[in-house]
Amino acid sequence: VSKLFSVKDLEETRPGSKESKALTADWLQGEITICLTDEVRNEINLNPDQLKRQRGRDFALRFPTLVSPHEEVDNNLNALKLLLPKRPRRGDEADIRHLAHAIAGRAQFFVTRDSALLRRADEVRDRFGLSIVRPSELIVRIDELVREAEYQPTRVAGSLIRIGRVPSQQESDIVETFAQSENRSDFQQRLRAFLVEPQQVEASIVRDPDQHLLALLVYDRRTNHRLEIPIFRVADSYLGKSLTSHLILQTVLVAADERRATIKLSDPHLSESVERALQTGPFVRIGNSWIKFNLRTLETTTSLVIRLKSFEADTVEEREYLRAMIQTTTQSLLAKEARALLEVERALWPMKIVDLDIPIFIVPIKPEWAMHLFEKKMAEQTLFGAKPEIALNRENVYYRAAKPRVLSAPARILWYVSSSKKYQGAMHIRACSLIDEVTIGTPKDLSRQFRRLGIYEWKDILGIAKGHIDNQLMAVRFSDTELLNTPVPWKDLQHILAQVEGHRSQIQSPLHISNESFARIYSRGVQL
């Protein structure tokens, strides 16, 4: 049973009232009973404005009255008066009368936005067993019980960094860490407005293994075709840049999996580092927001133009952007400009243009490398997980022998994780990436050039060169890796290759495949 502190919180439109009104949401009605005390009705009757008095009485009829024996109320009043400050503020005595009725009526929660009452919450709970909480706090507590699994933090990119929904009693730490150029109380109020709608708004925090807050992001799903991110904050840390890029990439995949064609990042207080990452996202600045259109489809160039014309655009600027993209796609198709079409594909990632004229390869990779470069499910099978400074990168590098020199850029990769008794899920096509650059050089030159990328240490690179520092190696820089929702097993892969390519393959080295093979494998992997 919960008691609302003030009937005006529900009845009127005023700052903060939305937080209290959220307690009347349909999904909560089976979880809580909102009651009024006699004290609320007394306050209504004392209102000198006849119209407001009658409106208050009519509104109060919507809620049951908490039964509270008068003798117990009086006893509680005497005990509660000891909690009053030496110089009581206006309204303090009314507050304790509310509390006295709630305690006598055996309420479990006393719900209020009054900061003075909330400061006394520990004393009241310890002495009387009544929990004084904000509306947002109560709603999060209930949602934690209803959807317990969603509040259990999960690994980020297979590392020991974890992400999960904002749990109860975390608000002050979050505000302290992530309030930026805005007023802290304004930020706190914005955050609460999202926390009270957990059925449609998902607020998540990212923590490192030592429980330090690294990031806060809010997904607003109240519009069917759009995923809006009204809050996107990343704390300053050595992982800040790579974590930002990773969270942006994952946001795009979430929207695509939910078949939401538009992402709108509308946080008015983004840091400069987040804005830089969005530009390479690629998001575009339209008005005061950052927008990205995306598709979870395989398209021919012709069907893509038709698809773009069907997009829902909410503003004139968005329509102009789509019109320009349609024009670029059409012109590139006529001119057979593969690189220009690839840029269109990147803008609509994870959409794939199946008739794009770039090479496609199946590339074998050992599980030990895959788990750090992209394969989070394998990393989760280990005690220490993937190295976050590698796994969070949007781009990485993969080394192999320089021969056979079949790989080129730009190109697509389907990653085949080779056989291993140590890891579950080996011998599957598990991910798809784009090759951005292929470089041939000596171990020392490549190590120096790509030092900031990849999991490979000098001993690993030298090992690939069979211990000879003059041997030529190939460094493959790749990006925009997308894990397949349903990895394609060896047996199914061989069946597709036999049907389309006319032969099977042991996949001991990079294998060039056709657009049709790619379309079948990818469609199977992402369940199109």
Residue ranges and their predicted role:
Residues E182-L227, I231-V234:
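A conserved beta-strand-loop-helix scaffold within acyl/acetyltransferase catalytic domains
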Residues L66-V111, S115:
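Active-site neighborhoods of divalent-metal-dependent phosphate/nucleic-acid chemistry enzymes
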Residues A261, R276-E389, M427, V438-L528:
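Contiguous surface segments at macromolecular interaction interfaces
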Residues P230-L243, P268-H269:
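A short, internal acetyl-CoA/4′-phosphopantetheine-binding micro-motif in the GNAT/acyltransferase core
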Residues E11, F109, S115-Q188, R192-L195, ...:
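Acidic, PIN/NYN-like endoribonuclease modules and their adjacent C-terminal/linker elements
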Residues V1-L36, L46-Q54, S115:
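Short, well-structured N-terminal submotif of metal-dependent ribonuclease cores
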Residues L239-A256:
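Conserved acetyl-CoA-binding loop-helix of GNAT-fold acetyltransferases
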Residues A255-H269, S289:
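Conserved GNAT acetyl-CoA-binding A-motif
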